[in-house]
């Protein structure tokens, strides 16, 4: 084995030299130079500095403006709440541990940080699944006259939380475990060992299949059918130009969110899968650290995409920041009236 396994950790370095120590008790500067740990701390500070204001602002503006409280926006706000969980439950912890060079909060702190990081990522993924299904049902119309209403949105939010908990909670109760990963300053699911006493192998397979592959398959199925339907509708002029434009803009925004999610999380999932399927292989701490920390940037992109691509929200945000007045004088009257076929109650205004 090219790593050192302890009771609650796995350090990606052989202990033949005798330098490996518990990441809960000693600085891990034998894994990487101290400046690299400082760089990780600075990176996490940047994510906190950007992630908290932009997510909190998105949440606050939506609460302040009643016209933004549409059913589809409930799902988008669910993404924001997931991001805030990651910022408070994960980023602050990881920044402090990186500053110290090891996981100073101990095993319990590792479980808490790993839980919030996993929960936030899974809520985001399952929220994107709900958005994809909503877009598919609304645009492709497999069920005629379906209207995505408030009850559907609430069920979608509840579903995303149930599925996320089904992924993040089992390690807390003995099915798999959370351990430090990479440079040992952040925690995640144990992909490094089979650990038969906690049935780790079965959990990792369950997680990859149920909480990664299946959601992505649903998303790709929905958008694959959706793209074909939009092209066909445009060719046959089945909907009004305004309706087609609104549906395309909403769909484009959600697709960009999906692409951003894949960019952030697929490298991490790929590396984790490689490590799991190549037990004992030789890899350095940086190999897992870079994709793990890159995945954390996902807490920023959803609200940014929402702000950039939603003109109605931008106007509301400017009005809120300017104490009730929009200096640009660009109140989007059409945004509040955007008509999307069979789904006027779930509208998200186009940019």
From Swiss-Prot:
A lipid is attached at residues 322-323 (S-palmitoyl cysteine). Residues 340-351 have a biased composition (Low complexity). Glycans are attached at residues 2, 15. Disulfide bonds join 110-187. The modification N6-(retinylidene)lysine is found at residue 296. The modification Phosphoserine is found at residue 341. GO terms for cellular component: membrane; photoreceptor disc membrane; photoreceptor outer segment; plasma membrane. A motif ('Ionic lock' involved in activated form stabilization) lies at residues 134-136. Belongs to the G-protein coupled receptor 1 family. Opsin subfamily. This is Rhodopsin. The gene is RHO.
């Amino acid at each position: 084995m090219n790593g050192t396994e302890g009771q609650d950790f796995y350090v990606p370095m052989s202990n033949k030299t005798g330098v490996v120590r518990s990441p809960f008790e000693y600085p891990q500067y034998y894994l990487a130079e101290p400046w690299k740990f400082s760089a990780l701390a600075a990176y996490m500070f940047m994510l906190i500095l950007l992630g908290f204001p932009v997510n909190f602002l998105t949440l606050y503006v939506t609460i302040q403006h009643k016209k933004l409280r549409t059913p589809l926006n409930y799902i988008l706000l669910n993404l924001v709440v997931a991001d805030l969980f990651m910022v408070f439950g994960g980023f602050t912890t990881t920044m402090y541990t990186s500053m110290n060079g090891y996981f100073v909060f101990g095993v319990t702190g590792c479980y808490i940080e790993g839980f919030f990081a996993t929960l936030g990522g899974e809520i985001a993924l399952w929220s994107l699944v709900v958005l994809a299904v909503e877009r598919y049902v609304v645009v492709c119309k497999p069920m005629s006259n379906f209207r995505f209403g408030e009850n559907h949105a609430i069920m979608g939010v509840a579903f995303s939380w149930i599925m996320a908990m089904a992924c993040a909670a089992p390690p807390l109760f003995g099915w798999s475990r959370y351990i430090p990963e990479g440079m040992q300053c952040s925690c995640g699911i144990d992909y490094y060992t089979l650990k038969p006493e906690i049935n780790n192998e079965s959990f990792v397979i369950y997680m990859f299949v149920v909480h990664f592959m299946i959601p992505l398959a649903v998303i790709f199925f929905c958008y694959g059918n959706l793209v074909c339907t939009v092209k066909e509708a445009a060719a046959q002029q089945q909907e009004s130009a305004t309706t087609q434009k609104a549906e395309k803009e909403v769909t484009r925004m959600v697709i960009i969110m999906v692409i951003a999610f894949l960019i952030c999380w697929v490298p991490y999932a790929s590396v984790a899968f490689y490590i799991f399927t190549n037990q004992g292989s030789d890899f350095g701490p940086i190999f897992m650290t870079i994709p793990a920390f890159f995945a954390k940037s996902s807490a920023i992109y959803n609200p940014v995409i929402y702000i950039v691509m939603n003109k109605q929200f931008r106007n509301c945000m400017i009005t809120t920041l300017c104490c009730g007045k929009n200096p640009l004088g660009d109140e989007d009257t059409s945004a509040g009236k955007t008509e999307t076929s069979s789904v006027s109650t779930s509208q998200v205004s186009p940019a």
